[in-house]
Amino acid sequence: MKVVHCESIPLAPVQIEGAVGAKVRCLIGEQDGAPSFTMRQFEIAPGGCTPKHAHAHEHEVFVLEGTAAVLMGNAEHALQPGTAVFVPPNVVHQFRNTGSSPLKFLCLIPHPLRGMSQTCVAACGCE
């Protein structure tokens, strides 16, 4: 079992080409004995974004703070606190902070990370 306050885990820059002002912390993952999912918290600066990308695994997102737009395929959707997002496998997606304060969201991804290289996993802060 693990009980931790998110702010006790340092934020690390997302080191993937196309990421702007994006940081991540791995809250719970395989290293903690979680057999099925990794829970990450992202923080994106105003005007920042995650890279536009796709991968073989799904993920689920829950917006905690800020306003954003998510691009999924050719559609863009506005996000606000309390919004949940399901990103299916192999769909091109990107999260952009459209507000004037930091965007914070939780992102859950499954194990194993099908289609995600170890380099990409490390760049997202969850080795």
Question: Each predicted region: which residue ranges?
Answer:
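Conserved short histidine dyad/triad with adjacent acidic residue
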Residues: 40-55
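Short beta-strand His + acidic residue motifs that chelate non-heme Fe in jelly-roll/DSBH
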Residues: 50-52, 70-71, 87, 93-99
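Glycine- and acidic-residue-biased ligand/ion/polar-headgroup-sensing regions
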Residues: 57-59, 63-68, 73
